[in-house]
């Protein structure tokens, strides 16, 4: 089994975006703790399967972040299931999850499932629009959601998602301070070693996504920046 509490760095690949085989090899052998496959836009079963089969050639843990029921495929090491705690639509908190379990529950091992308590904080990102997230939150609201994740729902992961923009490091610091058992993931705006170190100072795990497609060489540098 994989222990996510030991992770520090994750690359997130969008199956709807292009990456060369050479880039994928460099990424998978970079020393990152896992490769997460997922996205919020036009994710298809075929694209997920194609990308998974390529990542599977390497030893790095391969994880599917489930964003649509139609793109759940077998063969991943872990399945990350987001529940968007600050969504105004209950489908994104538990409704879609019930549908997924109804269809695939008997096929999925509980040991392979990791539930992420998402808090989406960039009002302009696709994920916020898709999930109808309430992004007008102050730090006390965010800490309250973190406590909901850990103390009420006993979730293994609380995920601060800024998706496309760099968040406030003080917010990450204060959020981390209220978590004892739940692992804090941070994603959004990490584009180079400097921004990686800034967010990794307080988050347990940083997720690097868009930078892979915008400046690949700088994205690669984020691994050693946080793992040494």
From Swiss-Prot:
Pathway: Membrane lipid metabolism; glycerophospholipid metabolism. Sn-glycerol 1-phosphate binds at residues 12, 159-164, 189, 209-210. The keyword Transferase applies. The keyword Transferase applies. Keywords: Lipid biosynthesis, Lipid metabolism, Magnesium, Metal-binding, Phospholipid biosynthesis, Phospholipid metabolism, Transferase. Mg(2+) binds at residues 14, 40. It catalyses: sn-glycerol 1-phosphate + all-trans-heptaprenyl diphosphate = 3-heptaprenyl-sn-glycero-1-phosphate + diphosphate. Prenyltransferase that catalyzes in vivo the transfer of the heptaprenyl moiety of heptaprenyl pyrophosphate (HepPP; 35 carbon atoms) to the C3 hydroxyl of sn-glycerol-1-phosphate (G1P), producing heptaprenylglyceryl phosphate (HepGP). This reaction is an ether-bond-formation step in the biosynthesis of archaea-type G1P-based membrane lipids found in Bacillales. This is Heptaprenylglyceryl phosphate synthase. It comes from Bacillus licheniformis (strain ATCC 14580 / DSM 13 / JCM 2505 / CCUG 7422 / NBRC 12200 / NCIMB 9375 / NCTC 10341 / NRRL NRS-1264 / Gibson 46).
């Amino acid at each position: 089994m994989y222990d996510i509490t030991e992770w520090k760095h994750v690359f997130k690949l969008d199956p709807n975006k292009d990456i060369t085989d050479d880039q994928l090899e460099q990424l998978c052998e970079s020393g990152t703790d896992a490769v997460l496959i997922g996205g919020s836009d036009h994710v298809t079963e075929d694209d997920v399967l194609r990308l998974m089969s390529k990542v599977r050639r390497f030893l790095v843990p391969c994880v599917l972040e489930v964003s649509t029921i139609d793109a759940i495929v077998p063969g991943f090491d872990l399945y990350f299931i987001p529940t968007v705690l600050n969504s105004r639509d209950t489908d994104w908190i538990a409704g879609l999850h019930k549908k997924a379990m109804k269809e695939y529950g008997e096929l999925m091992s509980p040991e392979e499932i990791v539930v992420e308590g998402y808090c989406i904080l960039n009002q302009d990102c696709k994920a916020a629009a898709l999930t109808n997230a309430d992004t007008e939150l102050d730090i006390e609201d965010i800490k309250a959601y973190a406590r909901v994740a850990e103390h009420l729902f006993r979730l293994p992961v609380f995920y601060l998602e800024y998706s496309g923009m760099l968040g406030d490091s003080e917010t990450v610091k204060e959020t981390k301070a209220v978590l004892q058992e739940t692992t804090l993931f941070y994603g959004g705006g990490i584009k180079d070693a400097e921004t990686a170190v800034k967010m990794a100072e307080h988050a347990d795990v940083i997720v690097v996504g868009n930078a892979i497609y915008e400046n690949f060489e700088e994205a690669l540098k984020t691994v050693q920046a946080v793992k040494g």
